[in-house]
Amino acid sequence: IMSDFDSLTFIFDEPSVGLHEREKEKLIQVFQEIVAAGNTVIVVEHDERIISIADYIVEIGPGAGAEGGKLIFQGNYNDFLNCKDSIIAKYLKESNYFIENYKHHMDTAPILHSDNKLCIRGANINNLKNLSLSIPLYRIVGFAGVSGSGKSSPVAHTIVPKLKQILRNRVI
C-alpha cells in the first residue's frame, strides 16, 4: 500500500510506549520506509532512541502545564545536543546515550527549499503562545519535551486541522 502513496504526512503520538528495544528498531525502520517513499513522519516522543533518528527536532517546554508552551529548540540533532536551554538535550548529552553510539545523518541530508516546509506562525493553543516554527517535509520530525509541556498541542490542534483543510478537496 505504501508504494501507491507519496507526499502524505503520518503523525504518531508516543508510538514507542511499551515497546521493547527490538520493537523500537522495527518502528524506526517503518518510519524510514515511510520517508523513503516520499512522505513526512511527525513523531511526538520521549524515547531517546526515537529522538536520535529524527532529521529535525522541535522541543516545547521548558516545564509542564503553565511552565511549558514555549519553543525551546528547532533544528537538527547535533545542534539539539548543544542547546543550553533544553532539558532533554542536557539529559541526552550527560547520559552520553547516543553521542558515542550513533552518528546522526542530518549532516548529509539535502537542504530543503522553502516550499518543502510546513510553516506555523503565531499559533496560540492551550499553553502555547505565539508559537512559530517551520517543519521540513519528507523527513522524520520529532517533537520532544517533558510531559505536559505542550508537544502534542501544535500537532493535534494546528498541523492536523491545517492538513485537513488543505487536503479537503483533493482526491488521494
Task: Locate the predicted segments by residue.
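Conserved phosphate-binding elements of NTP-dependent enzyme cores
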Residues: 1-172
